[in-house]
């Protein structure tokens, strides 16, 4: 089965199976706009959306997507005016070992974490570009409960190398920013290569497709092709999507 989540209002969530497609959630609020959806296992899934009354919208399922419910106002992260989740690549959510992370951008760029299936949250400021609607964290990935990376920048100035990434080795409590010399500009999506011990990553941007073999501190270009989103099927198979194209790459370790 798979799920489809529309953007705009009304926000519609469909569950598709061989037997057919079913609408499982509908949000008619005039400000409803959902940005990212992720399943943490075959039962628990989460979707997050732009703030309403200063609160991030958080939608969850506990039965494999058959039914969905919003977290209450007090259970959702409070966002600053102009702060939101970006919908660039459906990678603003990460989940490892029962811990959940969501990144934001805009007027402020932060990472929110939860260890109780999105009932309560902690927040940490990120050292990424921020202060404008086009700036912030666009993508987050964790290899394990300690090692993670956030990437983004300014999508209107994709060549700007300042404030485009940061790395953590303590589960997101602290973040070390990438220097401009070690960046390649705005990033829409970053993923760890499975079974790489957290050393190998792939990232995509308007500047091309890049890879790292040292946890994300240094990058080399794989291709000048422009992609917006990435997904590893396994450690040897990477799917990349862009404007009117989907490519499959075979990852060869050396």
Regions found by a protein language model. Name each.
Residues 10-29, 59-79, 112-130, 155, ...:
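Asp-box/BNR beta-propeller loop motif
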Residues 153, 179-210:
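Loop/turn-rich, solvent-exposed surfaces of beta-rich toroidal or solenoidal domains
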Residues 7-9, 51-55, 105-107, 157-162:
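Short, solvent-exposed loop/turn segments at conserved positions within beta-propeller repeat blades
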Residues 54, 64-112, 122:
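Solenoidal tandem-repeat scaffolds enriched in leucines and small polar residues
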Residues 32-38, 134-139, 186-191, 226-235:
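Repeated scaffold domains used in trafficking and secretory/extracellular systems
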Residues 29-34, 77-87, 130-135, 183-187:
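Short glycine-/Asp-/Thr-/Trp-enriched loop segments that recur within the blades
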Residues 231-254:
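Blade-level signature of beta-propeller repeat domains, shared across WD40, Kelch, NHL, RCC1
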């Amino acid at each position: 089965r798979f799920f489809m989540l529309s953007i705009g209002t009304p926000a519609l969530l469909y569950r598709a199976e061989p037997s057919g497609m079913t609408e499982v959630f509908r949000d008619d609020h005039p400000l409803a706009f959902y940005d990212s959806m992720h399943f943490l296992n075959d039962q628990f899934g989460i979707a997050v959306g732009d703030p309403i009354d200063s609160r991030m919208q958080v939608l969850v399922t506990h039965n494999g997507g058959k039914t969905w419910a919003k977290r209450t106002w007090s259970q959702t992260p409070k966002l600053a005016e102009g702060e939101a989740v970006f919908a660039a690549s459906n990678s603003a959510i990460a989940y490892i070992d029962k811990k959940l992370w969501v990144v934001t951008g805009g007027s402020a760029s932060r990472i929110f974490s939860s260890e109780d299936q999105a009932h309560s949250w902690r927040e940490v400021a990120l050292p990424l570009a921020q202060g404008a609607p086009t700036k912030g964290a666009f993508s987050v990935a964790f290899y394990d409960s300690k090692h993670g990376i956030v990437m983004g920048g300014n999508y209107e100035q994709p060549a700007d190398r300042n404030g485009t990434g940061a790395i953590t080795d303590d589960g997101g409590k602290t973040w070390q920013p990438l220097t401009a010399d070690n960046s390649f500009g705005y990033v829409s999506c970053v993923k760890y290569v499975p079974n790489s011990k957290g050393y190998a990553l792939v990232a995509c941007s308007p500047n091309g497709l890049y890879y790292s073999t040292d946890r994300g501190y240094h990058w080399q270009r794989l291709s000048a092709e422009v992609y917006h989103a990435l997904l590893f099927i396994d450690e040897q198979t990477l799917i990349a999507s862009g404007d009117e194209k989907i490519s499959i790459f075979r990852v060869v370790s050396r």
